[in-house]
């Protein structure tokens, strides 16, 4: 049984032992490293070298946004993109697949230069692949590299460029609108006939060309068609441009008249000519004294239908002049510069994507022009003032497995190709004299510096084993003794000799891998830390975890490492290799790798193994809905707090949600190394800092934990529920661990001060400390459900079902709560959820309790690492992944159809959506698909509210903030519907600020029914308590609600009279003994709810409105008191009463927390205050300040970009919902008018008399 199967079996075994399961979340801000600077060129499999920033922008349009906050943006690609990548085991360059692209903020970079003259800038924590003297390829952080280390660099690149046919088509595309293509008579007639069959006018309209119909027809008739029009025409009529390439002529369209038509040369000749012109050209002139080259040029020109003359001048080099069309073609295809050619030449995509034969001809042309064969250096060289061109030429040579090095001198740069192996593969020369010199050079060429394999001779001795040295070749002992360094050639000789004497085995295979020419091992000559302010980029290559960039092998971040190590909990070295159950092989039957971060691991504690299911929790306020759903699935949470910054506001928000769901916390204080090395705090000061953080967390637990757990759940150093450390460096410490190992806090300080944190990570690995804490202090499902069920399940905990749930009984009735629904193109809807009781099985018929429909389970699975593995069944206490549940929603209860359990309550979220966008399909035929997608998105994310208007085609989507809505829009686009999205619209509230004691009458349209109401504000303490989730009236019995309302300050009589609650609005029945009232009460409630959804001022939702029904006259005949009579009557009374009670507009507010260097404090406060914001608090920590501000949501659009500019990228900021405040008086009228006009209402808001008087009165 392989490793993967063993681990899968271990997972399956542990999932049946609930006492050994821990379902946990991490409450933290995720930091990400391992990135490259924007200018870094990534070597794609299609042949291109693309800057990291440009590649990110290109690929994000082909992906799905999976994460976005102030510091990080991540996209999952719909189709992976090929890139050159290193298979570390075989030491071969292969094609890897980019699956995700990342953009992050960085404030520091490390620049690394190696011996071939190339350099790269990465983040300090980025890991390079380094050849260890032991022969192993190991990982080493950028900021730990030393001069003399040998980095693994590429010598070979994957090239899957254009075929010759594709190249010919691309030529026409690039010639574009600046060239006419002249078709031979026969082809011209054929094209014209095809066009006539389609209809000239219809074709002209379809192509949407920028010329008149007559001109279009004229071009077709004459067979002289603009190249860009021909490209579109060929696609529309089914013509193959590649077939036309050899038959047509082209002319350049100048401002005055077109140039003389010429034929296109054969592709290889075209590239050779381009290489010559890049070397010796000056726009339309080629200056070169070689008669052989002159002869080649004349031949190529003749093939193009040109006759060129060689101009010879005394004392000067001979020159050939070309007509204007030739340099114009080179400009269109190769970006050949008109002026300052030497400085401006570059290698473009047309060249990098060309067939290898063509690229080889370009290199030959360039070296024929400017190259030199240097006998003294045993090298071929070429010199240019353009460093960028030579660096790209270096990468072009790697397509032929040719190593080269770059040197600077006297204002120019020289590229050298040396060493027998590279010279042999070098494309060579057409020029006979240089070709002959190269031939002679190769006869005596030896190995170059770039062919070194810097491993210890001791490795050879170990591989040789018992074979005596006398059986090896002469001078072999010099290699084994280390007197002579190994090269690839000498290593090959060693390997073949060892094989000849019968040596075999894994060690020998490893030597063979190191002798391959796919990579070279280059010495580090410079490591320099540089300050930086801006974005960095990463590209996830899932199988090989690296990609080729700038000639380096760049190690990248895997998603599973990121979820764990990035969240600051698991050491990076162990996350991928030992701890996480992550495997390179892909199971064909697996449905999806869940990006909601359900990751599992097995951890050993005191000799027992435990299955730990980690559910990642987003940190951004825009995703608070995701946090709540994650908290529903877990029993415990690791709260990560930065030692420097303290408890961040969003950490507090998430912890509050966790405690409300009865999730038990433990505390990890992160970045302790910064207190020691940066802030240089004394042990006493550090202790005070820790006590402050622990006290703050315990204060929240005291305030928000269930009464019976307020003391038990408090965290403390003594019992080990608090740990300290640095996730960045991978170490952690706790009191029990210190007692067990003898490590003291004094040792910790010394390790940090002496820059030995890596050694500390070996002594005290963070994963060991944190996961020990998890197993010891956080509950298993059986323990947790005993006290959680009464909070999260509305049924009677003492009933049979309640007891089954509390016991987490796998043999009881099925109850699974769906917390997340994702769409997978292979598996369909994948529902992830917590199984609270019973067992869910493949093929089982189940009942969706909230939707009241039956469906059948197709597959079930659990998580192993980040992957889903199939099992026959998943028992209670586990996180299950289920396919086949059609139309399932996040929050749904999955149960048995014969005897369904009472559904769990709908998941509650604190924040109501505050921002809305209008979404419209650009193409009307996409409307049904858009509606389907919007329904699906509402399923996946219950915090999204969608209003669909199938008549107008415009749909309103409301979310938690600007970022949230951007992500929703992107999800729609990536599912194939092109949409128009309006500017974000703020969702205001309407509230009353006075009391209307007068009984306001509302008459029904038939005048047979009258309702009398009073209106006043709900007590603000009650409104805030509901908004903060302290209680939910919809979950409570009438008696419970009555007591709670009185507790928060409502009058007893009012509390007893509450008939219904809509959000934070209350409808009270204060009538006594009214006949027929019970029969119309449902309609009165419906009218009240409609009025609260759309208030009188601007049809915005209401907040904190208390409506009391005090009297009524109701017609005895039911016919006269139906919905059409009662609902308008009560709404008119409510609206009239609200207007008399001084109704005003309320706007949503956000807290803004900005951490920034002190120098930028003024810029931040100015930015906040310029948005109608106020500064609430400023705290100082060293030279950093934390500014707390408050501003209206309406003013916060574009804040991310503006704050970044104002602070030059130095600000870290978060926002949090801050309730509602009255709109300033001077703005209110204008805002109401704008809202009403937007909704198609008359601009002026209504007056009380518009509702209080009789209809038509």
From Swiss-Prot:
According to the record, the residues making up region (Disordered) are 1237-1257
This protein's record includes keyword Cytoplasm: yes
Q: Which GO terms describe its molecular function?
A: endonuclease activity; GTP binding; GTPase activity; translation elongation factor activity
Q: Name one cellular component (GO) term.
A: cytosol
Q: Name its cellular compartments.
A: Cytoplasm
Q: Which UniProt keywords apply?
A: Autocatalytic cleavage, Cytoplasm, Elongation factor, Endonuclease, GTP-binding, Hydrolase, Intron homing, Nuclease, Nucleotide-binding, Protein biosynthesis, Protein splicing
Q: What else is known?
A: The intein interrupts the GTP-binding site.
> What does this gene product do?
Catalyzes the GTP-dependent ribosomal translocation step during translation elongation. During this step, the ribosome changes from the pre-translocational (PRE) to the post-translocational (POST) state as the newly formed A-site-bound peptidyl-tRNA and P-site-bound deacylated tRNA move to the P and E sites, respectively. Catalyzes the coordinated movement of the two tRNA molecules, the mRNA and conformational changes in the ribosome.
Provide the family line.
Answer: Belongs to the TRAFAC class translation factor GTPase superfamily. Classic translation factor GTPase family. EF-G/EF-2 subfamily.
User: Which HAMAP family does its entry note?
Assistant: EF_G_EF_2_A
Q: What is this protein called?
A: Elongation factor 2
Q: What is the lineage of its organism?
A: Archaea, Methanobacteriati, Methanobacteriota, Methanomada group, Methanopyri
């Amino acid at each position: 049984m392989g490793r993967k199967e063993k681990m899968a079996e271990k997972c399956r075994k542990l999932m049946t032992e609930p006492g050994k399961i821990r379902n946990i979340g991490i409450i933290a801000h995720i930091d990400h490293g391992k990135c490259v600077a924007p200018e870094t060129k990534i070597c794609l499999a299609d042949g291109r070298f693309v800057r990291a920033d440009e590649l990110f922008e290109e690929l994000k349009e082909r992906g799905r946004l999976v994460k976005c906050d102030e510091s990080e943006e991540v996209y999952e690609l719909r189709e992976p993109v090929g890139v050159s990548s290193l298979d570390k085991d075989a030491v071969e360059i292969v094609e890897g697949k980019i699956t995700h692209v990342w953009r992050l903020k960085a404030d520091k970079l490390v620049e690394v230069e190696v011996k071939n003259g190339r350099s790269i800038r990465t983040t300090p924590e980025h890991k390079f692949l380094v050849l260890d003297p032991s022969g192993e390829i190991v990982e080493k952080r950028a900021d730990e590299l030393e001069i003399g280390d040998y980095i693994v660099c590429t010598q070979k690149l994957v090239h899957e460029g254009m075929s010759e046919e594709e190249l010919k088509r691309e030529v026409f595309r690039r010639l574009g609108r600046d060239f006419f293509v002249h078709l031979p008579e026969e082809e011209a007639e054929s094209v014209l006939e095809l066009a006539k069959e389609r209809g000239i006018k219809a074709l002209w309209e379809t192509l949407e060309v920028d010329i008149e119909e007559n001109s279009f027809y004229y071009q077709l008739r004459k067979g002289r068609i603009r190249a860009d029009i021909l490209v579109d025409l060929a696609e529309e009529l089914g013509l193959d441009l590649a077939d036309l390439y050899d038959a047509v002529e082209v002319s350049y369209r100048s401002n005055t008249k077109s140039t003389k038509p010429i034929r296109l040369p054969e592709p290889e000749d075209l590239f050779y000519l381009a290489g010559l012109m890049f070397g010796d050209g000056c726009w339309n002139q080629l200056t070169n004294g070689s008669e052989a080259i002159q002869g080649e040029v004349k031949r190529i020109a003749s093939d193009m239908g040109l006759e060129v003359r060689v101009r010879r001048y005394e004392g000067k080099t001979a020159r050939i002049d070309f007509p204007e069309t030739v340099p114009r073609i080179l400009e269109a295809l190769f970006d050949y510069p008109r002026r300052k050619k030497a400085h401006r030449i570059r290698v473009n995509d047309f060249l990098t994507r060309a067939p290898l034969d063509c690229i080889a001809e370009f290199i030959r042309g360039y070296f024929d022009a400017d190259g030199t064969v240097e006998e003294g250096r045993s090298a071929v060289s070429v010199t240019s003032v353009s460093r960028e061109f030579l660096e790209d030429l270096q990468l072009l040579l790697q397509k032929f497995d040719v190593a080269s090095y770059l040197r600077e001198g006297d204002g120019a740069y020289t590229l050298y190709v040396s060493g027998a192996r590279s010279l042999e593969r070098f494309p060579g020369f057409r020029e006979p004299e240089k070709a002959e010199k190269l031939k002679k050079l190769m006869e005596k060429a030896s190995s170059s510096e770039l062919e070194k394999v810097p491993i210890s001779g001791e490795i050879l001795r170990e591989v040789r084993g018992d074979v005596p040295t006398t059986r090896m070749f002469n001078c072999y002992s010099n290699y084994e003794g280390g007197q002579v360094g190994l090269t690839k050639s000498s290593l090959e000789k060693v390997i073949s000799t060892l094989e000849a004497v019968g040596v075999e085995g894994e060690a020998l295979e490893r030597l063979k891998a190191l002798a391959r020419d796919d990579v070279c091992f280059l010495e580090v000559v410079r490591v320099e830390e540089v300050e930086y302010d801006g974005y960095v980029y990463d590209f996830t290559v899932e199988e090989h975890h690296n990609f080729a960039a700038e000639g380096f092998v760049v190690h990248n971040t895997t998603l599973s490492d990121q979820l764990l190590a990035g969240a600051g909990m698991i050491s990076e070295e162990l996350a991928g290799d030992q701890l996480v159950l992550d495997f390179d092989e892909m199971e064909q039957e697996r449905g999806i790798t869940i990006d909601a971060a359900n990751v599992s691991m097995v951890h050993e504690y005191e000799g027992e193994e435990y299955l730990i299911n980690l559910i990642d929790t987003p940190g951004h306020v825009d995703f608070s809905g995701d946090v709540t759903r994650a908290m529903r699935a877990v029993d415990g949470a690791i709260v990560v707090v930065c030692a420097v910054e303290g408890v961040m506001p969003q950490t507090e928000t998430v912890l509050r949600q966790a405690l409300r769901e009865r999730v038990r916390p433990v505390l990890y204080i992160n970045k302790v190394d910064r207190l020691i090395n940066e802030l240089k705090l004394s042990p006493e000061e550090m202790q005070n800092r820790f006590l402050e953080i622990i006290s703050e967390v315990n204060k929240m637990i005291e305030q928000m934990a269930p009464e019976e757990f307020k003391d038990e759940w408090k965290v403390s150093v003594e019992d080990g529920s608090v740990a300290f450390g640095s996730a960045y460096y991978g170490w952690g410490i706790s009191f029990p661990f210190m007692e067990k190992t003898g490590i003291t806090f004094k040792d910790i300080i010394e390790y940090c001060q002496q820059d030995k944190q890596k050694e500390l990570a070996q002594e005290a690995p963070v994963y060991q400390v944190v996961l020990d804490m998890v197993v010891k202090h956080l509950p298993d499902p059986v323990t947790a459900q005993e006290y959680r069920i009464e909070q999260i399940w509305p049924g009677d905990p003492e009933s049979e079902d309640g007891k089954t749930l509390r016991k987490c009984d796998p043999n009881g009735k099925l109850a699974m709560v769906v917390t997340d629904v994702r769409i997978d193109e292979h598996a369909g809807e994948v529902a992830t959820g917590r199984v609270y009781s019973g067992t869910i099985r493949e093929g089982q018929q189940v009942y969706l309790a909230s939707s009241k429909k039956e469906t059948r389970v197709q597959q079930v699975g659990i998580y192993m690492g980040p992957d889903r593995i199939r099992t026959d069944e998943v028992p209670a206490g586990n996180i299950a992944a289920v396919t086949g549940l059609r139309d399932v929603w996040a929050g749904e209860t999955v149960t048995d159809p014969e005897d369904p359990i009472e559904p769990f309550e709908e998941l509650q979220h604190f924040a109501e959506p505050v921002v809305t966008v209008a979404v419209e399909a650009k193409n009307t035929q996409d409307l049904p698909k858009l509606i389907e997608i919007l329904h699906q998105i509402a399923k996946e994310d219950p915090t999204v509210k969608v209003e669909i208007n199938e008549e107008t085609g415009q749909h309103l989507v409301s979310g938690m903030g600007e970022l949230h809505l951007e992500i929703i829009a992107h999800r729609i686009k990536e599912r194939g519907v092109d949409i128009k999205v309006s500017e974000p619209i703020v969702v205001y509230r309407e509230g009353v600020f006075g009391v209307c004691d007068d009984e306001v009458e509302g008459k029904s349209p038939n005048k047979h029914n009258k309702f009398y109401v009073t209106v006043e504000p709900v007590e603000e303490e009650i409104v805030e308590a509901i908004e903060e989730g302290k209680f939910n009236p919809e979950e409570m019995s009438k008696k419970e609600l009555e007591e709670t309302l009185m507790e928060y300050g409502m009058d007893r009589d009012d509390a007893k009279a509450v008939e219904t609650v809509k959000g934070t609005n209350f409808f009270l029945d204060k009538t006594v003994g009214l006949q027929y009232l019970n029969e119309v009460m449902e309609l009165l409630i419906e009218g009240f709810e409609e009025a609260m959804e759309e208030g009188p001022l601007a049809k915005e939702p209401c907040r904190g409105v208390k409506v009391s029904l005090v009297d009524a006259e109701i017609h005895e005949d039911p016919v006269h008191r139906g919905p059409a009579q009662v609902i308008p009557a009560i709404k008119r009374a409510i609206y009239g009463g609200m207007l008399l009670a001084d109704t005003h507009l309320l706007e949503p507010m956000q807290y803004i927390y900005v951490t920034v260097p002190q120098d930028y404090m003024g810029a931040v406060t100015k930015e906040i205050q310029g948005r109608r914001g106020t500064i609430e608090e400023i705290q100082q920590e060293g030279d950093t300040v934390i500014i707390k501000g408050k501003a209206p949501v309406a003013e916060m659009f574009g804040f991310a970009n503006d704050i970044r500019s104002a602070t030059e990228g130095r600000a870290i900021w978060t926002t949090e919902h801050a309730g509602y405040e009255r709109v300033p008086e001077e703005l209110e009228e204008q805002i109401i008018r704008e809202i009403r006009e937007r909704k198609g209402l008359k601009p002026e808001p209504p007056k009380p008399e518009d509702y209080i008087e009789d209809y038509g009165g």
